[in-house]
């Protein structure tokens, strides 16, 4: 088995947060932190340096997962993915996140999405096709295509 991904989970609903945390740990990953607000999440990103941040788009305290994604993007070197039932609310660039996982999702959908995201983090470009229930940002798909063609280093799209 490969080394577990270090994952930070940002979700404002406690029961959903616990369920996601349990699913991640059962899949063999390491949850390095959980946050229910953007402020907590941004502090934990700096403190824990996760490899992957799973972010709910709408947070209950009035903050937005977009704020978290922007902080992750600014820090660099960390992959972000949204989890939301409202994927159409995201702009095409997904605020710099790699992907969005549609809620509600099953354990299978989450596990397949994590396999894809693990390849994004550790072995880009992913060799698997995008799993059902997940949408990848067009800039990331283009970057992966360039990597496969050998015309770009193995990293995601340039951050502006």
How should each PLM-predicted stretch be described?
Residues 56-57:
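Active-site residues of response regulator receiver
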Residues 63-78:
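Short amphipathic alpha-helix used as the core "switch/output" element in two-component signaling
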Residues 112-115, 119-160:
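CheY-like receiver
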């Amino acid at each position: 088995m490969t080394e577990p991904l270090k994952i930070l989970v940002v979700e404002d609903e406690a029961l959903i947060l616990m369920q996601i945390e349990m699913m991640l740990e059962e899949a063999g990953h390491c949850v390095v932190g959980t946050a229910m607000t953007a402020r907590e999440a941004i502090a934990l990103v700096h403190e824990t340096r996760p490899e992957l941040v799973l972010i709910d788009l709408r947070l209950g305290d009035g903050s937005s997962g977009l704020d978290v994604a922007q902080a992750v993007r600014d820090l660099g070197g960390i992959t972000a993915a949204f989890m939301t039932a409202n994927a159409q609310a995201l702009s095409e660039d997904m605020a710099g996140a790699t992907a969005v996982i549609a809620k509600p999702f099953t354990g299978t959908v989450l596990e397949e999405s994590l396999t894809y995201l693990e390849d994004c983090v550790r072995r880009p470009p992913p060799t698997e096709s995008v799993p059902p229930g997940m949408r990848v940002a067009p800039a990331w798909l283009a970057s992966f295509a360039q990597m496969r063609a050998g015309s770009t280093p193995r990293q995601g799209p340039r951050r502006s």
